């Protein structure tokens, strides 16, 4: 925990599990700014591409995130521009690693950047998600760059039907492809005390409704909530679970 300003503290935790896959190709980072209190970056990457390509792609996302955040200066640099640059640079570096990979490496990305003024910048590409909760209530979440999300947008599929659709894992864009990655940016003007952010890969969110996520994240400290979400996802996967990764960050009142 860190206490960036009077009245609240930041409480956070990460989670990572291989699931039932042979290889771990998800990666997660929660970074505190080296020079500015109350500034943090959370990043999720879900890599794809053979036994090594996906891991290389996810690792490249993490390395680029670390380097970008190291250069970031709150108050001087625009947070959304910084996240856009991070996605673009990671995409280009993944493209370079494709030269030595047995399969073309790809990765999703979901990231949020919290500034000391409690403004949050959000970026995502692919089907890794970011949820914003106030208490147990969902205020917003990112929309996937996926085939089934397109069907949902067109009114041809419900959220529930999308979970069991045979092409549910087909992405319409991500990092490392020959096309530029889709980058969806958003801003939360001010995170309130009691608010929580969840970034996670599809290996986690696939097994929960937003109501369940909100109840668990609101009812437990972030570390305990992370452990419960991982354990429940593993149970519900019934031996067929994907890699999963998550970050929970919550503003808590002091005292």
Residue ranges of predicted features:
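PP2C/PPM-type serine/threonine phosphatase catalytic domain
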Residues: 1-255
